[in-house]
C-alpha cells in the first residue's frame, strides 16, 4: 500500500466514502448563527458560525421550497455531512432549518452538555454519603442572597450545633461563571463535612451558570458530599444531576442537611437505649459463656481427678504385684541357695575328718591310691584338728 500512488480524485472519493459512511455525521442536528447567505441557481449556500468555528452549508432547491434565511439568526439545522469532490471540501447538506430563540438556544446547550457528561459516565458515578449530623457546612452562594438567609434562618430555628462557612460568588451575570469556579475550588481546600450550593429561583438565563460545563466539572472535583438547592420547584439545572443530593429550594436543602436539635436528642436517646440493650445482651451472652466454660472446666477437673485416682490405684496394684513377685523370687532363690549350700557342704573333703578319717597329702596333693606311695615317702596326715608328718616304712 505504501508504494501505491493515488490520484486527487481517488483521495477525495475515499474521503467522501469515509465521511458519508459515518453514522455520527449522517442525519444529525447542528446549531449556530446563520451567516453569509448566498442564493445560487435555486440553491441556498450559507455558513453556520460560532465564536471560533465555521461550517459551510447548502440547501439544494431551497428557493423552490420557499426557504428564506435571515442573517444573524440562531438556527438548528438538520442534515448530513458530505464531500464536494471537485473542490475537495466538505459541507453540510441541510434538510431542515429551525430558528431558535434564546430559550431554544439554552435548551440545545443544556441537552448537549448533559449528553456529553452522560457519555463520559459522570452522571452515573457513585454518590457520596451525606452525614446525618454534620458539624462543618460550606455554603456556596452570594453573601447578599435570600438563599443564604434561608439557610441561616433554618439553622437558627433548628438550634443545631454547626459551623457555617460561606464561599461568596455571584450566581448570575457575566462574572458568575468565573467566581463560582473560584468558590468551588476554595471550598475544596477546607475540611468540611459537606458543601451546599444554593440559589433562589429565576429565569433559565438567570440560572444558566449552573449548567456551564466547566462549572459542572468543578463540582464533580469536590471531595465533599454536595447538596444543591437551586431555584424553585420547576427549575432543574445540570448541577442537580451531579450533586449527591438535590433539593428543590435552598430551604429544602437546609432542612435536609441541618438536623433539628430535638432530632439529635431523640437519636441520642435511641442510641443510648440501643447501646444499653446491646451491652446487656452482650453481658448476658458472656455470662452464659463463662458459666458454660466453668462447668466444662469442672467436668474436666473431675474427670482428670478420677483418672488420676484410677492411675494411683493401678500403680498401687502394680507395686503390690511387683513386691509379691520379688518376695517370691527371693524366697525361691533362698531355697536354692540353701540347697546348694548343703550340697557344697556335703562335697567338702574335710567333712569326713570329723568322723575320725584322716586325709593323706603328698606334696600338697591328696593321695587317693596306696600305689601313689613308696617306702620312705614323707606325707602329711590331715586330722580334723591339725596336721602331722609321717614316713612310709612298708
From Swiss-Prot:
- Subcellular locations according to the entry: Cytoplasm
Enumerate the GO terms in the molecular function aspect.
Answer: exodeoxyribonuclease VII activity; nucleic acid binding
E.C. code: 3.1.11.6
- GO biological process terms, semicolon-separated: DNA catabolic process
Question: Enzyme group, top EC level?
Answer: hydrolase
According to UniProt, the reaction catalysed is: Exonucleolytic cleavage in either 5'- to 3'- or 3'- to 5'-direction to yield nucleoside 5'-phosphates
- CDD domains from the xrefs? ExoVII_LU_OBF
What's a Pfam family in this record? Exonuc_VII_L
Source domain of life: Bacteria
| Single GO cellular component term | exodeoxyribonuclease VII complex
- Which controlled-vocabulary keywords does the entry list? Cytoplasm, Exonuclease, Hydrolase, Nuclease
**Database matches in HAMAP family:** Exonuc_7_L
- What's this chain's function? Bidirectionally degrades single-stranded DNA into large acid-insoluble oligonucleotides, which are then degraded further into small acid-soluble oligonucleotides.
Which family does the entry's similarity section mention? Belongs to the XseA family.
- Report quaternary structure and partners: Heterooligomer composed of large and small subunits.
Q: What's the protein here called?
A: Exodeoxyribonuclease 7 large subunit
Give the species this sequence originates from.
Thermotoga maritima (strain ATCC 43589 / DSM 3109 / JCM 10099 / NBRC 100826 / MSB8)
Q: Which gene encodes it?
A: xseA
Amino acid at each position: 500500500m505504501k508504494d501505491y500512488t493515488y490520484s486527487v480524485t481517488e483521495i477525495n472519493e475515499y474521503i467522501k466514502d469515509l465521511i458519508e459512511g459515518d453514522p455520527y455525521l449522517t442525519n444529525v442536528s447542528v446549531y449556530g448563527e446563520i451567516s453569509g447567505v448566498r442564493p445560487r441557481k435555486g440553491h441556498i449556500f450559507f455558513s453556520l458560525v460560532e465564536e471560533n468555528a465555521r461550517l459551510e452549508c447548502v440547501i439544494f432547491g431551497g428557493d423552490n421550497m420557499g426557504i428564506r434565511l435571515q442573517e444573524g439568526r440562531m438556527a438548528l439545522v438538520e442534515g448530513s455531512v458530505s464531500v464536494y469532490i471537485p473542490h475537495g471540501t466538505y459541507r453540510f447538506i441541510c434538510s431542515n432549518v429551525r430558528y431558535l430563540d434564546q430559550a431554544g438556544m439554552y435548551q440545545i446547550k443544556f441537552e448537549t452538555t448533559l449528553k456529553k457528561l452522560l457519555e463520559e459516565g459522570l452522571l452515573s458515578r457513585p454518590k457520596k454519603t451525606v452525614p446525618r449530623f454534620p458539624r462543618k457546612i460550606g455554603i456556596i452562594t452570594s453573601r447578599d442572597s435570600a438563599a443564604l438567609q434561608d439557610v441561616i434562618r433554618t439553622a437558627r430555628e433548628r438550634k443545631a450545633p454547626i459551623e457555617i462557612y460561606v464561599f461568596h460568588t455571584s450566581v448570575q451575570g457575566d462574572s458568575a461563571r468565573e467566581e463560582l469556579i473560584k468558590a468551588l475550588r476554595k471550598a475544596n481546600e477546607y475540611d468540611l463535612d459537606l458543601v451546599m450550593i444554593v440559589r433562589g429561583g429565576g429565569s433559565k438565563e438567570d440560572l444558566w451558570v449552573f449548567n456551564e460545563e466547566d462549572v459542572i466539572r468543578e463540582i464533580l472535583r469536590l471531595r465533599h458530599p454536595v447538596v444543591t438547592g437551586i431555584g424553585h420547584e420547576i427549575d432543574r439545572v445540570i448541577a442537580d444531576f451531579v450533586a449527591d443530593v438535590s433539593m428543590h429550594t435552598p430551604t429544602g436543602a437546609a432542612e435536609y442537611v441541618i438536623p433539628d436539635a430535638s432530632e439529635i436528642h431523640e437519636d441520642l436517646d435511641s442510641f443510648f437505649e440501643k447501646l444499653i440493650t446491646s451491652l446487656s445482651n452482650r453481658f448476658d451472652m458472656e455470662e452464659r459463656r463463662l458459666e458454660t466454660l466453668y462447668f466444662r472446666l469442672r467436668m474436666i477437673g473431675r474427670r482428670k481427678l478420677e483418672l488420676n485416682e484410677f492411675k494411683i490405684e493401678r500403680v498401687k496394684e502394680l507395686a503390690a504385684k511387683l513386691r509379691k513377685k520379688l518376695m517370691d523370687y527371693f524366697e525361691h532363690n533362698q531355697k536354692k541357695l540353701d540347697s546348694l549350700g548343703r550340697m557344697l557342704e556335703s562335697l567338702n573333703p574335710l567333712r569326713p575328718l570329723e568322723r575320725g578319717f584322716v586325709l593323706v597329702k603328698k606334696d600338697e596333693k591328696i593321695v587317693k591310691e596306696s600305689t601313689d606311695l613308696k617306702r620312705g615317702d614323707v606325707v602329711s596326715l590331715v586330722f580334723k584338728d591339725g596336721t602331722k608328718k609321717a614316713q612310709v616304712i612298708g
